Amino acid sequence: MLGYSERDGFHGSKRLAKAMKQQQKKIKGVILMDMVGDRDLRITVPRNCTADLRLLALEAAEATGDRTKIGLFDGIIYDDHQAFLDLGFPAIDLIDFYFGNRPGENDYWHTTKDTLDKLSADSLLTTGRIVIEMINRL
Protein backbone atom coordinates (compact mmCIF):
# COMPACT_ATOMS: atom_id res chain seq x y z
CA MET A 1 0.00 0.00 0.00
CA LEU A 2 1.29 3.45 -0.87
CA GLY A 3 1.44 6.18 1.74
CA TYR A 4 -0.60 9.36 1.38
CA SER A 5 0.02 12.80 2.81
CA GLU A 6 -1.84 16.11 2.56
CA ARG A 7 0.78 17.31 0.07
CA ASP A 8 -0.33 14.57 -2.35
CA GLY A 9 -3.52 16.55 -3.00
CA PHE A 10 -1.84 19.52 -4.68
CA HIS A 11 -1.79 18.15 -8.22
CA GLY A 12 -4.16 20.80 -9.59
CA SER A 13 -2.41 23.76 -7.99
CA LYS A 14 1.02 22.46 -9.04
CA ARG A 15 -0.17 22.09 -12.61
CA LEU A 16 -1.71 25.58 -12.67
CA ALA A 17 1.36 27.19 -11.10
CA LYS A 18 3.63 25.45 -13.60
CA ALA A 19 1.43 26.59 -16.51
CA MET A 20 1.45 30.18 -15.22
CA LYS A 21 5.24 30.05 -14.92
CA GLN A 22 5.67 28.64 -18.43
CA GLN A 23 3.36 31.33 -19.84
CA GLN A 24 5.39 33.94 -17.95
CA LYS A 25 2.23 35.36 -16.39
CA LYS A 26 2.66 38.52 -14.35
CA ILE A 27 0.93 37.54 -11.12
CA LYS A 28 0.59 40.22 -8.43
CA GLY A 29 -0.68 37.74 -5.89
CA VAL A 30 -2.36 34.39 -5.48
CA ILE A 31 -5.08 34.52 -2.83
CA LEU A 32 -6.27 31.12 -1.64
CA MET A 33 -9.46 30.98 0.41
CA ASP A 34 -9.88 27.66 2.20
CA MET A 35 -12.64 26.59 4.59
CA VAL A 36 -13.81 30.17 5.14
CA GLY A 37 -17.53 29.43 5.36
CA ASP A 38 -17.69 28.36 9.03
CA ARG A 39 -20.22 30.16 11.27
CA ASP A 40 -17.46 31.00 13.75
CA LEU A 41 -15.10 32.59 11.21
CA ARG A 42 -11.47 32.76 12.35
CA ILE A 43 -9.23 33.30 9.34
CA THR A 44 -5.66 32.22 9.91
CA VAL A 45 -2.76 33.44 7.78
CA PRO A 46 0.18 31.02 8.14
CA ARG A 47 3.82 32.02 8.15
CA ASN A 48 4.50 30.40 4.76
CA CYS A 49 2.85 33.21 2.82
CA THR A 50 4.37 36.22 1.10
CA ALA A 51 5.07 38.80 3.84
CA ASP A 52 3.62 41.73 1.88
CA LEU A 53 0.39 39.81 1.30
CA ARG A 54 0.14 38.89 4.98
CA LEU A 55 0.34 42.58 5.85
CA LEU A 56 -2.09 43.46 3.05
CA ALA A 57 -4.66 40.98 4.41
CA LEU A 58 -4.53 42.60 7.86
CA GLU A 59 -4.78 46.10 6.37
CA ALA A 60 -7.71 45.06 4.19
CA ALA A 61 -9.52 43.50 7.14
CA GLU A 62 -8.96 46.67 9.15
CA ALA A 63 -10.35 48.78 6.29
CA THR A 64 -13.48 46.64 6.00
CA GLY A 65 -14.10 46.51 9.75
CA ASP A 66 -13.34 42.79 9.90
CA ARG A 67 -9.97 42.83 11.71
CA THR A 68 -11.27 40.65 14.56
CA LYS A 69 -11.92 37.84 12.06
CA ILE A 70 -8.31 37.42 10.89
CA GLY A 71 -5.00 36.73 12.56
CA LEU A 72 -1.47 35.66 11.82
CA PHE A 73 -0.25 32.15 12.59
CA ASP A 74 3.44 31.47 13.28
CA GLY A 75 3.18 27.93 12.00
CA ILE A 76 3.29 26.58 8.48
CA ILE A 77 0.22 25.22 6.71
CA TYR A 78 0.79 23.30 3.50
CA ASP A 79 -2.08 24.20 1.20
CA ASP A 80 -2.58 24.90 -2.49
CA HIS A 81 -0.83 28.28 -2.25
CA GLN A 82 2.46 26.47 -1.63
CA ALA A 83 2.72 25.36 -5.27
CA PHE A 84 2.76 29.02 -6.32
CA LEU A 85 5.25 30.01 -3.62
CA ASP A 86 7.55 27.20 -4.72
CA LEU A 87 7.68 28.71 -8.23
CA GLY A 88 8.29 32.25 -7.01
CA PHE A 89 4.78 33.68 -7.16
CA PRO A 90 3.55 35.86 -4.27
CA ALA A 91 0.82 33.89 -2.50
CA ILE A 92 -1.31 33.86 0.64
CA ASP A 93 -3.54 31.29 2.32
CA LEU A 94 -6.65 32.62 4.07
CA ILE A 95 -7.80 29.55 5.97
CA ASP A 96 -10.20 28.92 8.85
CA PHE A 97 -8.60 25.90 10.46
CA TYR A 98 -10.87 26.01 13.52
CA PHE A 99 -13.90 24.38 11.94
CA GLY A 100 -15.97 22.26 14.26
CA ASN A 101 -18.42 21.62 17.02
CA ARG A 102 -16.43 23.70 19.51
CA PRO A 103 -13.78 26.37 18.89
CA GLY A 104 -10.44 24.73 18.25
CA GLU A 105 -11.88 21.24 17.80
CA ASN A 106 -11.68 21.09 13.99
CA ASP A 107 -13.77 17.92 14.31
CA TYR A 108 -15.85 18.45 11.13
CA TRP A 109 -12.88 18.64 8.76
CA HIS A 110 -12.84 15.77 6.22
CA THR A 111 -15.70 13.94 7.95
CA THR A 112 -19.36 13.25 7.18
CA LYS A 113 -20.18 16.20 9.48
CA ASP A 114 -18.59 18.60 6.96
CA THR A 115 -21.95 19.49 5.39
CA LEU A 116 -23.65 22.52 3.82
CA ASP A 117 -25.68 23.29 6.97
CA LYS A 118 -22.41 24.37 8.63
CA LEU A 119 -21.90 27.20 6.12
CA SER A 120 -22.54 30.83 6.96
CA ALA A 121 -23.40 33.42 4.32
CA ASP A 122 -22.06 36.09 6.69
CA SER A 123 -18.66 34.39 6.91
CA LEU A 124 -18.47 34.07 3.13
CA LEU A 125 -19.44 37.74 2.79
CA THR A 126 -16.79 38.80 5.32
CA THR A 127 -14.10 36.84 3.52
CA GLY A 128 -15.24 38.26 0.20
CA ARG A 129 -15.04 41.82 1.52
CA ILE A 130 -11.50 41.29 2.74
CA VAL A 131 -10.37 39.69 -0.53
CA ILE A 132 -11.96 42.39 -2.70
CA GLU A 133 -10.21 45.03 -0.59
CA MET A 134 -6.93 43.15 -1.01
CA ILE A 135 -7.39 42.99 -4.79
CA ASN A 136 -8.21 46.69 -4.95
CA ARG A 137 -4.95 47.45 -3.11
CA LEU A 138 -2.69 45.16 -5.16
Language-model regions: role of each:
Residues 6-10, 46-50, 54, 77, ...:
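Solvent-exposed, acidic/flexible segments
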Residues 75-100:
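Short glycine-rich, acidic/polar surface loops and turns
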Residues 67-68, 92-93, 101-105:
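Substrate-binding/catalytic groove segments of enzymes
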Residues 1, 28-34, 91-95, 110, ...:
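Structural recognition of the beta-strand scaffold that forms the well-ordered cores
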Residues 43, 66-79:
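Short catalytic/ligand-gating loop segments at beta-alpha or beta-beta junctions
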Residues 18-22, 58-66, 86-89, 132-137:
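Sec-exported extracytoplasmic/periplasmic mature domains
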Residues 102-138:
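His/Asp/Glu-rich mid-to-C-terminal helical/loop segments that flank catalytic regions of hydrolases
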Residues 1-52, 56, 81:
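Acidic/histidine-rich catalytic neighborhood of metal-dependent amide-processing enzymes
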